[in-house]
Swiss-Prot record:
GO molecular function annotations of the record: DNA binding; DNA-binding transcription factor activity
Classification via HAMAP family: TATA_bind_prot_arch
GO terms (BP aspect): DNA-templated transcription initiation
Start and stop residues of the Sequence repeats: 8-84, 99-177
Stated family: Belongs to the TBP family.
Gene3D superfamilies according to UniProt: TATA-Binding Protein (3.30.310.10)
Protein name: TATA-box-binding protein 2
Role this protein plays: General factor that plays a role in the activation of archaeal genes transcribed by RNA polymerase. Binds specifically to the TATA box promoter element which lies close to the position of transcription initiation.
Source organism superkingdom: Archaea
The gene coding this protein: tbp2
Keyword annotations of the record: DNA-binding, Repeat, Transcription, Transcription regulation
């Protein structure tokens, strides 16, 4: 699939690192942490190597976003657990990390006629209102992803749980456009 290989833009994952957190303690110990419960019920903490951001909640749950691959998610969550342990906050060992969403981009390297694609894919499978949004929204059942198709030939795939889901979504689009003679 060299002509349309994906680039992962964002991985969102969640885990439970403890039974509960005192977010004011974490905010006071983690440089750059932001916590204002009047504005948002969680603490925001950004890391740079690898780059990611955390939303940390009093329930002990943590959401990691901004990572560029699944391995980085595991790395930064492991680093977060170590940092919490270093300030005396006990964390769970081997927490289960669940990927919630992967956003990826791809390029078909050709100009696309979105009106023809909308008709070809069937209006029941797509949303296309160019006055409101320049892309065609295509919901695929297998893999269960949403692909935004742009006239530039660029694609954005969202909803995947694995990089393979995103690759498969791009391949489904490529095959269908090819079958319609639109590639």
């Amino acid at each position: 699939m060299s002509e349309s290989s994906i680039k992962i833009e964002n991985v969102v994952a969640s885990t439970k690192l403890a039974e509960e957190f005192d977010l004011t303690v974490i905010e006071s110990q983690f440089e750059g942490a932001e916590y204002n419960k009047q504005k948002f019920p969680g603490l925001v903490y950004r890391v740079s190597d690898p780059k990611a951001a955390f939303l940390v909640f009093t329930s002990g749950k943590v959401v990691c976003t901004g990572a560029k691959n699944v391995a980085d998610v595991h790395t930064v969550i492991g680093n977060m657990a170590k940092k919490l342990n270093s300030i005396g906050i006990k964390t769970m060992e081997n927490p289960q990390i669940t990927v919630q969403n992967i956003v990826a981009s791809a390029d078909l390297h050709t100009i696309l006629n979105l009106n023809a694609i909308a008709i070809g894919l069937g209006l029941e499978n797509i949303e296309y209102e160019p006055e409101q949004f320049p892309g065609l929204v295509y919901r695929i059942d297998e893999p269960k992803v949403v692909v935004l198709i742009f006239s530039s030939g660029k694609l954005v795939v969202t909803g995947g749980k694995t990089p393979e889901d995103c690759e498969s979504g791009v391949e489904v689009v490529r095959q269908q456009l090819d079958n319609m003679g639109l590639l």
